[in-house]
Amino acid sequence: EDVFEKFKDVKLILLGVGGVGSFALDALYNTGIKNITIVDFDTYEESNLNRQMGSFGNIGRIKVEALKEKYPEVTPIHIKITPEWIDDFDFSSYDYILDAIDDVKPKVHLIKKHFTKIISTSGGAKRIDPSKIEYISIWDTYNDPFIKKIRTELKAQGFKKKFKVIFSSELPMCLEKGSFE
């Protein structure tokens, strides 16, 4: 019970509330963590309906605003996550930074700047087997083209520090968005 009390008082910032980030938000919020800031710039589109929390009934709406209604204690920030925004934003009051960014440049910048308090994820698109989700060093990931791009860019920029990422080792299962042929 002491662990739960300590955990629920954690202050988190979640960057990206798409397919991975929205489910992370739902899981964290429903376990009692309420002090969560969510950051995203996107609006819900029809293609989000089968893979993003909060999308049903909210097509065309700003994601963080719709999620604020679903999870009333979160703090929404509607802004595009860029390297410049990362440089300007004060992350010091957060215990953890949850990285669900799906854009290489800001993701790499965030990792380089804040890798000691980051929990970084890859995407879940085209994957269906939850038993393939792993939490390992970014340098040991495989079968994930997005994380490979991140590794390649980090290496190109001389970043060699160790940190773990959440990713799926499953090979992508479908040819296009929403198609499991």
Map each language-model feature to its residues.
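Adenine nucleotide-associated cytosolic modules
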Residues: E1-E181
